[in-house]
Amino acid sequence: MKYNQESLVAIKGEIQPLIENHWSEIALNQDEIKLNPDWNMYGKLESLGMLKTYTARVENKLVGYFILVVTKGLHYADHTFAATDVIYISPEYRKGRAGYGLIKFAEQELKKDGVSVLVINTKDHAPFDRLLESMDFSLTERLYQKFIG
């Protein structure tokens, strides 16, 4: 398994099938909320240095990604936060340490870039809490969602 930081814009065509698999596996309200990535906004955020994309590859094949939005804290201007947009490992690579390796690689790279807080959210119906807790992450808040139309 090889981990890299890559340009989301550059790998758009390659990542799209994984994003579709991820959406069909995990997304709620699929009848109402269709997958429709805003590639222009991703590109703008990336050009501003506010979007970081980390990838997992096996023999050059993309098998996972971890995409984060990086911003100064609105309440904590002395700190830079990296918040998960999406994180995904193809099912056939979840048994090993691919997820751990991808998160650890991203954490190291983000720290080099001056990020002081890494925030990873998980779906309540598909958590990976044990992995995060084993990596010294703490449960810090709960998130509720309601489709309102």
Across the structure, where does each feature detected by a protein language model lie?
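Short amphipathic alpha-helix that is part of the acyltransferase structural core
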Residues: M1-P37
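Conserved beta-strand in the GNAT
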Residues: T55, K61-V70
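Conserved beta-strand-loop-alpha-helix junction that forms the acyl-donor binding cleft
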Residues: L118-D129, I148
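Conserved acetyl-CoA-binding loop of GNAT-fold acetyltransferases
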Residues: L132-R142
